[in-house]
């Protein structure tokens, strides 16, 4: 991991969304230098599903060697941001660094994204980043080490990253455009950069999106904290950059990236918005011996009369049991096109579960549409549902949480085949 150098000692960092996850990891890294941290987040009381509050984060920061100022801040609320900034200036004498980490996500298509969700993502991601930056800039301009760091992706205009979750992409790219515009506007005064992970990072949000078991395919928030530290300890002329965490750390001399993995050696889930297509990344993983997440099960003897699709559903049926039903509680409908078009369902909700052709007896919780050939590959472990979705080969309607559970279900099924 990247060692601390002490360069942030005495600096004041205003970090949004710092009560947990990546924001807290960045705060703790800076705290080890003896930095002052403003924990600007909404969670003041313990959440039933998400760990941490602004106060527990503050305690950890102080235990790590820093000073902490917990502030209740919803980045959509101008008054709350202004009040927190004033408290920070009163407590620490100014603000040197702003980290715009707070973010909201909904991986849903246009018709399935309510305007409430659109407003939430635009309000937190784009407007919140712009507003917090605007309020902090007068103080940042007085600092000799002024930085703004937005946790947002490179501006990749490949339509693949828009078509399945247009609203989320617009909201995240809004953060990136803030970095692009403000870096030029304040060149020489404030360094402004964006940071994005190469792979999925294990956070509470990722657990909610991917369900249990997704952690093995993720890296720890520490990799983003180290990359952020590397950026924030550079001079002001390092500005206007869209940085990828692992690429920067390799430039900084970090050779062993496995130390950041939750399960070292396990294949990693690529993050959104990067140039490599999901299929290219999957191929690269396989070339380097990463087989665990793409494991094809033991081959079954095929019936001479059964088609590949029928064989696939027979194999699925053999894996359905009460345990799978109890842990999943969902009905999947598959609308298949191509060589073997038709509707099939997987019931992991009622009684002992079941598989069949046509539509389920009760309404499906998730409807997945894709080519029958790709469906066969997906259930053979040769194509991950996440990658199929990201590349546009899989379209999803309904409960996204249940849809993301399918990856774990497939892994369990393939292990039994």
Swiss-Prot record:
Entry binding sites for NADP(+): 17-23, 42, 74, 172
A matching Pfam family: adh_short
Any one cellular-component term (Gene Ontology): peroxisome
Superkingdom per UniProt: Eukaryota
Keywords for the protein's UniProt record, in alphabetical order: Mitochondrion, NADP, Oxidoreductase, Peroxisome
Keyword Oxidoreductase: yes
InterPro entries: HSDL2 (IPR051935), NAD(P)-bd_dom_sf (IPR036291), SCP2_sterol-bd_dom (IPR003033), SCP2_sterol-bd_dom_sf (IPR036527), SDR_fam (IPR002347)
GO MF term list: oxidoreductase activity
Active-site residues from the entry: 168
Main location: other
EC number, UniProt record: 1.-.-.-
The SCP2 domain, residue ranges: 306-414
Subcellular location: Peroxisome; Mitochondrion
Coiled coil: none
Its biological purpose: Has apparently no steroid dehydrogenase activity. Might act as a metabolic regulator that affects systemic adaptation to nutritional cues.
Family classification: Belongs to the short-chain dehydrogenases/reductases (SDR) family.
Protein name: Hydroxysteroid dehydrogenase-like protein 2
Organism name: Xenopus laevis (African clawed frog)
